[in-house]
Amino acid sequence: MKRLVLLVVLVLAAGCGNPLAGGGEGGATGDIIIGASDVGESLLLAQIYAGALRDAGAANVTVRPPVGSREVVVKALQDKSLSVVPDYSGNLLRYFDKDTTATKPQDVYAQLRQKLPAGFEVLDQAPAEDKDLLVVGPQLAASGVKTFSDLGPRCRELVFGGPGQWSSRWKDKIKALYGCEFKEIRTTDTGGPVTVAALKSGDVQVADLFSTSSTIAANGFVPLVDDKNMFPAQNIVPLVARGTLSPAETAALNRVSAALTTEQLTRLNVEFTEEKRNPLDIAEDFLARNHLKS
């Protein structure tokens, strides 16, 4: 998902040290170690999980970013040096089943639960998603381009900007589903400032951003409706090392998931990236606002 530069204060607030050192058997019998990636959103979610778990009675909860690649995370959950990590349903499913064709939220979640190896579990998924979007400028949207199907016949006149791997993963699929063949596909970055600048300047007319990106509304960009579900669902879901959380702790994280919407997650990202708020304060405010603190 979208890459953010982690400020030093973020790491200090979350706790220092080797994220995969120590650990133990987790919350059901000991410490709970929450992993977070080198993405601001992941750290915010980890701090929200930590606050909810502490409120549920967990005595020793630590957030230790960054934990590295998904392969590293999976290994750490297997040996229980990590207890739980916030993740994304579609990406997790594709990791465990590279041949999956599921795209809708409930289909992705159901298949993910089926494909998880022994020793893992996913808790309830949140309504919140941070998934790929195709976005356009207001002029193109005003000309009648509101959906991917609207975009299809216009693609030959439009330049697209997105990450380097976009062509290998999506070029053939968008052609098959929507008849879309872009005039040119330019490599920008993964939903970051290079992509935003290219769309603002008109160097590209269509771009891949993420659904919780604060830059969409800030720049007047218009997200298109993926009316045939090309991009898979990416609901926020806790990935847990089985046996590391008590029933009360599991219930606490499920309550967090039930409360977390895409709109709220977008707002959390704005508070972090644009307002430069401390992630601990953001997490505490989220929990209080959603009545998740006793």
Model feature map: region roles:
Residues A28-S42, A59-P65, R156-G162:
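Short, well-ordered beta-strand elements
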Residues C16-L20:
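Bacterial signal peptide processing site
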Residues V74, S83, F160-D227:
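Ligand-binding pocket segment of bilobal, Venus flytrap-like solute-binding proteins
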Residues D132-A141, Q234-P247:
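A bilobed periplasmic-binding-protein/Venus flytrap-type ligand-binding module shared by bacterial periplasmic
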